[in-house]
Amino acid sequence: MNPYVLMILLSSLGLGTTLTFASSHWLLAWMGLEINTLAITPLMAQHHHPRAVEATTKYFLTQATAAAMILFASTTNAWMTGEWSITDLSDPLANTMFMTALALKIGLAPMHFWMPEVLQGLDLLTGLILSTWQKLAPFALIIQTAQNIDPLLLTLLGVTSTLVGGWGGLNQTQLRKILAYSSIAHMGWMIIVIQYAPQLTLLALGTYIIMTSAAFLTLKMSLTTKVSTLATTWSKSPILTATTALVLLSLGGLPPLTGFMPKWLILQELTKQDLPIIATTMALAALISLYFYLRLCYAMTLTISPNTTNSTTPWRTQTTQASMPLALFTMATLGLLPMTPAILTLTT
């Protein structure tokens, strides 16, 4: 892609998200979401491949449907209450419609069906943008309106997403689909606590973005997209293989890695709110997710691929890929748990 076009598209992504962040009027927020969608569409279709075009088409149709629902919900709310302000979403029908539309936008279960298929058709860097940056603007709107939305709807979306994210990833052989189901499960953790402690949702979103960025960058560095090729990565780069395994365990929420922090705090908050059954369900759903992360780690570090020839290990050769972003995200993914008290002080 032409670098000038790429710069314009990335700037438009930033502009759309910033516009949604800064707006208090429904039409401006909707416009920001649409700029985001239109900016990422050419990035998704830049590789002239049938799968990429199919993924782009699915994504565009899904986002257009969600955008139409948001516009309809906001006009319904304005018709019933006379208010266009985002925080004055008081009509029950508009509330439900709006939350359903945003759930479709970020891929919450049961509106998640597009997410694994779209992510599978993209390259890893575009998939990274879709899994991280594209979640920011919808979450800004959800956080602003969470207190007006039916708590039962939020709880159902959260529990369903964590269960579907766990079950869906169990039998997958494609790493991008596994990361898509991982994203769905993490979205569920954020939504379940948003009505009780929005600052914990922001903390979970921040750690999710860091961990997912580290996962995508490590997989891109090792040139791996399938579980079957994970077994060959140790001969190419043993250190990168060990790092990838730790990043995946952090995504699964295993202590003492960073991913344990948001899950622990969210379970603590749910218990404080006298919701032990929901907290137990979420913890068990996290165990299901942890299984497929452990399966990936087993394939990477505890299996040896068939090798009949005595070949020299290529891991001493210099890599041509940029490793600074990978190093930063990996360090944050593995080592932020001891800083939990400081992070809580900053977020509360």
Swiss-Prot record:
Q: Which domain of life is it from?
A: Eukaryota
Which Gene Ontology CC terms are recorded?
A: mitochondrial inner membrane
Q: Spell out the subcellular localization from the entry.
A: Mitochondrion inner membrane
Q: What's in the keyword line of the UniProt record? A: Electron transport, Membrane, Mitochondrion, Mitochondrion inner membrane, NAD, Respiratory chain, Translocase, Transmembrane, Transmembrane helix, Transport, Ubiquinone
Can you supply a Gene Ontology BP term from the record? mitochondrial electron transport, NADH to ubiquinone
Q: Fetch the InterPro entries from UniProt.
A: Complex_I_Subunit_2, NADH_DH_su2_C, NADH_UbQ_OxRdtase_chain2, ND/Mrp_TM
Enzymatic reactions: a ubiquinone + NADH + 5 H(+)(in) = a ubiquinol + NAD(+) + 4 H(+)(out)
Q: What is its EC number?
A: 7.1.1.2
Q: What membrane topology was assigned to this protein in its record?
A: Multi-pass membrane protein
- The enzyme class is translocase
Q: Does the keyword ATP-binding apply?
A: no
Q: Which GO terms describe its molecular function?
A: NADH dehydrogenase (ubiquinone) activity
Membrane spanning segments where? 3-23, 60-80, 96-116, 149-169, 178-197, 202-219, 246-266, 274-294, 326-346
Q: Which cysteines are joined by disulfide bonds?
A: none
Q: Which PANTHER family match?
A: NADH-UBIQUINONE OXIDOREDUCTASE CHAIN 2
- Explain the purpose of this protein: Core subunit of the mitochondrial membrane respiratory chain NADH dehydrogenase (Complex I) that is believed to belong to the minimal assembly required for catalysis. Complex I functions in the transfer of electrons from NADH to the respiratory chain. The immediate electron acceptor for the enzyme is believed to be ubiquinone.
The UniProt entry's sequence similarity note says:
Belongs to the complex I subunit 2 family.
This protein is called NADH-ubiquinone oxidoreductase chain 2
